[in-house]
């Protein structure tokens, strides 16, 4: 076989090998391209899934917060209802307490004929006040205290050498509160002070 024939045969073999290699390379490139596309698709699906998870997590957190707020408001409403449910009933009891107070004021404890009555009414009043105090009802008796417009209702003012100005000198009717909430203000007479206090006031201003 001549050299030319050998060379021609080698060239054919090389071309065949190169063609086969090119085909395999093209196939590998195509597979890699498809794999990259699939990876991108999977990454996008994963990103979408994570976004949905975050969205659902936020929804769950918001829902839990709303449930907690509703539960807290409901508890406050129940507490408020329980605290002041007796308000109407307590107001109905005030005339009874007033009548017992007037009965004590109109009875002389030193008089043997009325002493037993006084002691009986006094004992009943104490028991009654103890009972209603368990439900938060307490009397407001501001005798000798500074006038407080939030708890006292002044029915007038009078000069007094005994009580300083703007001091409750006489309680006409006790007030009452329910769990620190005013049921009825105390009806009071307020001191204007005495002449000496008026002079002192003038001297201070001078």
Swiss-Prot record:
Record Gene3D superfamilies: 3.90.20.20, Head domain of nucleotide exchange factor GrpE
One Gene Ontology MF term: protein homodimerization activity
Function: Participates actively in the response to hyperosmotic and heat shock by preventing the aggregation of stress-denatured proteins, in association with DnaK and GrpE. It is the nucleotide exchange factor for DnaK and may function as a thermosensor. Unfolded proteins bind initially to DnaJ; upon interaction with the DnaJ-bound protein, DnaK hydrolyzes its bound ATP, resulting in the formation of a stable complex. GrpE releases ADP from DnaK; ATP binding to DnaK triggers the release of the substrate protein, thus completing the reaction cycle.
Entry GO terms, CC: cytosol
Subcellular location: Cytoplasm
HAMAP family: GrpE
SUPFAM superfamilies the UniProt entry points to: Coiled-coil domain of nucleotide exchange factor GrpE (SSF58014), Head domain of nucleotide exchange factor GrpE (SSF51064)
Superkingdom in the source lineage: Bacteria
GO terms of biological process kind: protein folding
Similarity section: Belongs to the GrpE family.
Pfam families in the cross-refs: GrpE (PF01025)
This protein's name: Protein GrpE
Subunit structure: Homodimer.
Keyword Cytoplasm found: yes
Keyword Chaperone part of the UniProt annotation: yes
InterPro entries: GrpE, GrpE_coiled_coil, GrpE_head
């Amino acid at each position: 076989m001549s050299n030319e024939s050998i060379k021609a045969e080698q060239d054919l073999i090389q071309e065949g090998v190169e063609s086969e290699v090119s085909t395999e390379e093209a196939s590998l490139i195509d597979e890699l391209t498809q794999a990259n596309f699939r990876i991108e698709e999977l990454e996008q699906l994963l990103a979408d899934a994570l976004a949905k998870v975050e969205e659902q997590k936020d929804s769950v957190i918001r829902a839990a917060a709303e449930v907690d707020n509703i539960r807290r408001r409901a508890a406050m409403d129940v507490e408020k209802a329980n605290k002041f449910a007796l308000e109407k009933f307590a107001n109905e009891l005030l005339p009874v307490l007033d009548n017992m107070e007037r009965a004590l004021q109109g009875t002389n404890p030193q008089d043997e004929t009325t002493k037993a009555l006084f002691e009986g009414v006094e004992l009943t009043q104490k028991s009654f006040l103890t009972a209603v105090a368990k439900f938060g009802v307490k009397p407001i008796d501001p005798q000798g205290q500074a006038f407080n417009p939030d708890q006292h209702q002044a029915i007038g003012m009078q000069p007094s050498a005994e009580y300083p100005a703007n001091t409750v000198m006489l309680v006409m009717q006790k007030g009452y509160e329910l769990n620190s909430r005013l049921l009825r203000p105390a009806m009071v007479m307020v001191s204007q002070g005495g002449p000496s206090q008026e002079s002192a006031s003038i001297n201070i201003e001078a």
